[in-house]
């Protein structure tokens, strides 16, 4: 029983590590966007955000 529990926790940790890596990358990009938002105009920012959102969705489809 102990061996089964250990193997299960090992697989779960591997899954969590992969998720954390992606989330950290996304957080860094969000901070970059926030710093850039102040410089851009209101209309330009909206167009930029829309383009980023589309690209992210496309990449996600490619991932899975």
Swiss-Prot record:
UniProt-listed PROSITE patterns: PROTAMINE_P1
InterPro entries cross-referenced by the UniProt entry: Protamine_P1
Subcellular location: Nucleus; Chromosome
GO cellular component, one term: nucleus
GO molecular function: DNA binding
This protein's record includes keyword DNA-binding: yes
Region (Disordered): 1-64
Similarity comment: family membership: Belongs to the protamine P1 family.
Protein name (database record): Sperm protamine P1
Species the sequence originates in: Hypsiprymnodon moschatus
Gene: PRM1
């Amino acid at each position: 029983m102990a061996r089964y529990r250990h193997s299960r926790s090992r697989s779960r940790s591997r899954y969590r590590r992969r998720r954390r890596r992606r989330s950290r990358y996304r957080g860094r990009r969000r901070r970059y966007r926030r710093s850039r938002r102040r410089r851009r105009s209101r209309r330009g920012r909206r167009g930029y955000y829309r383009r980023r959102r589309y690209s992210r969705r496309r990449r996600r489809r490619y991932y899975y």
